[in-house]
Amino acid sequence: MSENWYALTPDDVAAKVDVDPAAGLPAAKAAERLAANGPNALAAEKPAPGWQRFLAQYKSYMQIILVAAAIASLAIGQITTGVAVLLITALNALGGLRQQGKAESAMNALQSMLKTSARVRRDGTEVKIDADQVVVGDVVLLSAGDDVCADGRIIEATSLQIDESALTGESVPASKSVAVVTDVNPVLGDQSNMAFMNTPVTHGSGVMIVTGTGADTAVGGISGMLKSAPTTKTPLTRQLDTLTLWIAGAAGLTIAIMFALGISRGDSTQAIFTTAIALALAAVPMAMPTVLQVILSSGARDLAAHGAVVKSLDSVETLGSTSAINSDKTGTLTMNQVTVVEVIDPSDRYTITGIGYGLDGEVQHTAGSTNTIEAAILPFLVANDAKLVNGKVVGDPTEGALLVLGHKAKINIEGTQDSLPRVATLSFDPTYKLMAVFCEAKDAAGAPVIRAFVKGAAPAVIGRATSALAKGASVPWDDDLSTRADAQMTRLGGQGLRIMAAATVDISPDGFDPTGDLLALVQGLQVTAIVGMIDPPRPESLDAVRSAQEANIRVRMVTGDDVVTGAAVAKQLGIEGEAILGTDFAALSEAERLERIDGIGVVGRVAPEHKVLMVETLRKKGAVVAMTGDGVNDAPAIKAADIGIAMGTGTQVAKNAGRMILTDDNFATIVRAVSEGRKLYDNMLKYIRFMLVALVTYVVTFLLASVLNIAGGQPFTAREILWINFVITAPVGIALGLDKETPGLMSRLPRLRSASIMSPAVITTVGLVGLFMAVAINVLIVFGENQYDTLGVASTMGLVAFSMMLIIAAFECRDEKASILRVETFDNRTLNITAVIEVALAVLIATGAFLPDLLGTVTLTSGQWLIGASPALVLFVGWEIGKLIARRRSGHVAAP
């Protein structure tokens, strides 16, 4: 049933859903509706069984090729090789499954948040029922401490306030009333006569008629968006999939050539299959998943130490490509601690230093001559039910901010409150927008009075005023004073400040009835002051936003607050761009959104669908988008973003939808995480360049050996290939992945979503280096066989050559253009140690006892070993010459 319930009167709503609010639904009618529409619950997301998720890990091209190679190995009797390869695929699958298992369903977390019971009227009596039995038309009773069980139209409200922060992002509880909302298509935060499922009642009481249950609620709509939000692969993952396919294709073509040549030469089928299996193993980067997981795990540990916990390792990689951050305002860019920054009365003006709930600020008297601020702010302190406990506010955050003001003014708040015994309270209500407490006091002559201390929205308080307090004396509230007050409020409002006013009025004790019409007594007020307050930016947010901008990352503020407040905070933080309402952004055509998005810096009063729309628009523009949030309303956009970031203090729904959790809720941590992500992405590219050199060398080496019939077409055995992959390239790759950050990394442009890891320069380098290494290996094998008349010596020399050239390649791959003949080349201690170990192993495979038996190599003389290692020196010289040419062409300056 889709209706604009907020636009209907309570009587119209009751008629629409066919219920008598006084009696509630008849039990029989409720049962009919329950049977027709189903329970008031959200559909749970059923996870796939563990075995299905395990088998799903075998859908990647690499896993398929490895399984095929293992089966072929077993078929021709190479049991050890086949079993080893199957174990490798199982380890890869378990690694992927382990990461997948950490991501709990956001939908199921949403389901678990729903309340379990509700108080309703049925057949004229109040009954308590399970929340999933609530139906449209039920009359639900609400009181402080309850969670709203469904969406409903409020028909009675007594000082009713509901915390809707999880749905709207607004940190202050929403005041509710029964009045019709006349706005057109208001966002949830502006529907003041509606209550929404799963929001807690914080104050007062009320009655509502249920208008939506289950999937037809605001929370249900969010659940639907979560269900429809696609799970996206990271940019690097997509490119590696494509790269693996290309390499597999090249290997497949080489294998076909090998088969054709082998058959034409009369080679045995088993020999041909053995060679084909060896090439298949060589052409697949089987160690890559392990190496990448080690690299990303290291980054994840570093991030966790700085307050950012990643749930999936590929999120670290995505951070490195982030080009746009859509950030929530409250608590992320700001402190989520309302702070009074200015106090104004008719004769004086004060600015207040310090931020948040800390008491270390002070009151600075910037205009006027009154000796003390106490009389001006006293109503804010007396008409106040909050408490400050260990730097935290217990109660309403706005009242807490006013208490902090009192402490900064050196006022004994508790003593002042005790000296003015409270006899009655008029609670805040959105219809009159103020609060008043009535206390026993004495007037200037010492006569007893009932003094009302009033605080509330400035227009509401001033509208009941006849005078003001100026320099300790009462002055009439005339046109001049009204004009001055309006000017000050306009100034404060333009700065995004929330404005409140305070006042007093003395009432005769005679005939005062604390249970009577207290609102009628709040007349003829004497205004004492107006205050401006704001949730201030975090001290570190300004530098963090600047750092993001210097890294060419566009920061946008997405907030549930109004546009003026958002724009004011954005200006303080240096966030550029126009401020626009979420509804206005959604009303644009897709072409207009794509055209205007670059100029937008703040989006206010956003609904969940607006946030998703922003993410989708930016992604269509080619941006890699990070989205932060903490509420249920943020979860769909968090899930839709390339990197969803949830606040540690946020809802479990948001945390489950996100890929990263900020334990300190701090925007600066996001920028630090992006820096770490860029470093790891850059290091992974170093590893990928190194890995590609090895893969191209493999394929070309086998191709040349087959065409020229060198070493029987099989330059390396399967055991030697596994050795190279897991004992040489894997440790070296990990060392590259743990490299230090390249200077100037954060000043680079973010990597475009469409940018290829295979740039023309990389293709040229990898192709030339791989070709040289392949030719060198085959030449050495031919030379060794002719010179020493034994294939064993020749093949071992080829393996030594490959090993030593890979060590040179590791150092050269650290930078595409910079020479390795500089001090910085050896600042990676892990790589230095790894290189020394690899050189030692290259010696042992040709001189020791155990490794030659394991690999099938033979013992070399020192002269033979040096000949085998000599191509590494030639490779070094050639690579350095190539880098020198590249530097001169690009004007790149580097140490020689």
What are the language-model segments listed below?
Residues 64-87, 246-284, 297, 301-307, ...:
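Helix-interface capping motifs at the ends of transmembrane segments in multi-pass membrane proteins
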Residues 40-71, 104, 126-127, 185-194, ...:
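Soluble-to-membrane junctions at the N-terminal ends of transmembrane alpha-helices
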Residues 372-374, 577-627, 641, 648-818:
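Membrane-embedded transport module
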Residues 1-22, 154-194, 306-450, 470-480, ...:
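Conserved cytosolic catalytic headpiece of P-type ATPases
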